[in-house]
């Protein structure tokens, strides 16, 4: 585990353009806590990249996993008041994984970014458990011109939602549970029901019943 910690430290420190006040005594414990928490989460994902018969996996040379670790670690650092290291961890994730996911975001357990290059996730949106997102996606507020940021409205996602490549969700959108958002779909200020596949662009969305549940990804 010491080698893994040192590898992560090397990545974060070398990526950041400024000197860091890195305290190994404090940060090693937070690293271990974060690492073990992710292993536990991954043990409940029915996917060979995330778990096997021996339990959860965290392969930090696999950039999807690196993004997950950086997000969870930065969030923990922020909670502990270690803002500079949280910023550096976020910075490392952003340049190595090409995903913009700020550590103040609220994401449920078993988050799965899948080759999520060029994806931007709204840090004020609410994301449920087993949220899965692919490349080129964008999530954010809508119609913000002339409004203060505190007036912006952000999307909410239920559990077991998958956003396929180049799909977008904006504004006062509420996405139900067990939903697949098809590639290229554009959702603006819409309420999406549970158990469906949605495609098209607002206001002309098309809905199909989801016959194979996203919940099959869950392993108890």
What are the residue ranges of the model-derived segments?
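Structural signal for interior beta-strand "rungs" in well-ordered beta-sheet cores
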Residues: 94-210
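Terminal amphipathic alpha-helical/low-complexity segments used for targeting or macromolecular assembly
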Residues: 1-94, 213-220
């Amino acid at each position: 585990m010491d080698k893994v910690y040192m590898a992560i430290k090397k990545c974060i420190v070398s990526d950041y353009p400024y000197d860091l006040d890195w305290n190994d005594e404090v940060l090693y414990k937070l690293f271990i806590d974060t690492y073990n928490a992710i292993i536990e989460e991954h043990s409940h994902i029915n996917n060979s990249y995330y778990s096997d018969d021996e339990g959860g996996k965290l392969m930090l040379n696999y950039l999807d996993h690196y993004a997950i670790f950086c997000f969870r670690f930065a969030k923990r650092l922020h909670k502990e008041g270690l803002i500079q290291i949280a910023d550096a961890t976020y910075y490392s994730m952003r340049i190595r994984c090409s995903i913009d996911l700020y550590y103040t975001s609220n994401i449920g357990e078993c988050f799965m970014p899948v080759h999520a290059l060029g994806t931007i996730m709204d840090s004020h949106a609410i994301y449920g458990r087993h949220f899965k997102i692919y490349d080129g996606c964008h999530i954010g507020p809508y119609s913000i011109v002339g409004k203060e940021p505190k007036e912006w409205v952000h999307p909410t996602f239920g559990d077991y939602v998958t956003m396929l490549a180049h799909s977008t969700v904006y504004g006062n959108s509420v996405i139900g549970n067990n939903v697949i958002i098809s590639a290229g779909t554009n959702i603006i200020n819409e309420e999406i029901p549970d158990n469906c596949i949605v495609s098209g662009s607002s206001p002309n969305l098309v809905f199909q019943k989801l016959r194979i549940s996203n919940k099959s990804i869950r392993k108890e």
